[in-house]
């Protein structure tokens, strides 16, 4: 009888703990064939998740409601493009385009640029076109290493997050997080270079391991950090720069390395390195 009672108590405790978690699994990304690159940044458009990969070999497309793999959009690929974060803009390249442009940051030691993609067509037959490459200042000049972009569509700004020293996993030497603000360049075919003199604001924060996906909504920036066993999600107020809150992702329901972070409507989603898509219960 005691065992039965204990089992019931444990089951109730686990159920209540699950309810308390910030994120719950929605579905597992399962492409028709093996992924040609590790999952990185992603966005939600047209009731679909567009999942970018390291090396930019392709974009996998999933139904956000059913979890089905709908299509793999081939890209030319670039070994030094990391596709660490992706953001949906509010800009349409051509009149009649169904989907807005997508900005993807190629953060690593070799590349510090942002690629702007136009995705056209319909579900199951999307096509992707590289429209613009935005070059960021050299890290040593900009004062930010491993730069990631985050779009602020409400104010027409680009935020760049990264590190004050050349390491994403070592806090020694005063290494910490840097967040810069630039004005978003106009869209045009070809390349555009942002200069260090274009920096409009700079903010400093305490070190966190491995910058990952980030998104801005309603004046707040949300970013995930870390690896399996040491990860977090942080919310910042854009106007004041204040860190509003931070939560341990393992305790919040995501045990593996977080990668993508994006909104679909009012719902926040996170995709981990293994392709598990998590839905946020409550912000």
Predicted features, each with a name:
Residues 47-79:
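Beta-propeller domains
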Residues 242-264:
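Conserved blade-ending motifs and adjacent loop-strand segments that build the rim/top face
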Residues 67-107:
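Blade-loop segments of beta-propeller domains
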Residues 28-57:
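Beta-strand-rich domains and repeat architectures in extracellular enzymes and scaffolds
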Residues 198-238:
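Loop/turn-rich, solvent-exposed surfaces of beta-rich toroidal or solenoidal domains
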Residues 35-45, 82-99, 143-156, 164, ...:
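Structural signature of eukaryotic scaffold interfaces centered on beta-propeller domains
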Residues 56-62, 109-118, 166-183, 229-235, ...:
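Structural motif
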Residues 30-35, 74-79, 134-142, 202-208, ...:
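Surface loop/turn motifs at the tips and blade-to-blade linkers of beta-strand repeat domains
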